[in-house]
Amino acid sequence: MSDEDWQVSRRLFAVLQGGVYNAMLYISRLPQDEREKYKKDFKKRLLDTETGFIKRLRKAEGIKWSFHTRDYHVGYVREMVAGPTTPHSLRLYVYISNPLWHSQYRPGLVNFNKEWPFVNLWIKTGFMWDDIEKQNICIGGEVSPGWGPGMIGIAIKAFSCGERKIEATPVMIIRGEINPKKWCGDCWNLMCLRNSPPETLQRLAMLACGVQAKSWRGCCNQRFVSPYRTPADLEVIQSKPGWCMLWRGKL
């Protein structure tokens, strides 16, 4: 082995600069006896990366997560949930796994970040995996349509609050079934985003009924879904959107 190759092998597992794919490609070219050793070491470092990501996530965003680990043949899958267990309460779910598992066991899945980590994110009532197709906010690190800049930041800020969040609708307010002032501004903003069409008078009216949220910026540069996002994507976390353009219709 040349000096250059030795430097590469020594540094490969300390920093994943080349990404998961390049690391596994490098391992596949090693002799058989070395391949298993380095593959085992690489998987351990992936696990350490994942654990560190989750710790930073919990600390940076202030969310009290509960989570468990499912061990599959390659790597780990973490399923995390934030929110109360009270019936009909909204909960924030996050599904994290490494792309090695998806490449081998979900070969047809193409819409995901091939680096680290793979993340799905959704908000719903009930159990984690019930009818999630319509609930996705983020699929594989890509923000879903309908969730504009700042909206994921609002979800994170709301779930940093311990108040119970429900599926509130304009009809419930009109009938007097709920009092919008009961919730803090952050929780109410999230409930409005979840249950009113974008850029409509209904949403604007719902927001006006609740407590006004205090202006804010993200507490750090934690990017939540991926360290590979662009500075423009960082706005999803750091800045909440203004409400002045939420309705463009005519009276």
Swiss-Prot record:
Keywords: Host cytoplasm, Virion. Its main location: host cell. InterPro entries: Vir_infectivity_fact_Lentivir. It comes from the Viruses. It is found in: Host cytoplasm; Virion. The keyword Phosphoprotein does not apply. GO terms for biological process: viral life cycle. GO terms for cellular component: host cell cytoplasm; virion component. Pfam families: Lentivirus_VIF. Determines virus infectivity. Belongs to the feline lentivirus group Vif protein family. This is Virion infectivity factor.
